[in-house]
Amino acid sequence: MALKIRLKRMGMKKTPFYRLVVTEATSPRDGRFVEEIGYYDPTKNPVVLNIDEEKALNWLLKGATPTETTRALLSKAGVLKKFDEARK
């Protein structure tokens, strides 16, 4: 069971809102997920990004791999830096 951290699209048409979720790699984009770890709203000014760092670190240490976009968001929030420190 390979786990990924990725974005789940929510919101209305042309006004996207995303949730950062941990899900199985084979499940659909908006399908079932294991746990929600944050949200991201690119339509607001400034952009809203809220990530539960403790949950994100826990899943990263368990082996969940973030997608490219999610990796950038985790890096922006400072979670990946803490992850690198925790691995050492």
Swiss-Prot record:
GO terms for biological process: translation. One of its GO terms (molecular function) is structural constituent of ribosome. Keywords: Ribonucleoprotein, Ribosomal protein. NCBIfam families: S16 (TIGR00002). The keyword Nucleus does not apply. InterPro entries: Ribosomal_bS16, Ribosomal_bS16_dom_sf. Belongs to the bacterial ribosomal protein bS16 family. This is Small ribosomal subunit protein bS16.
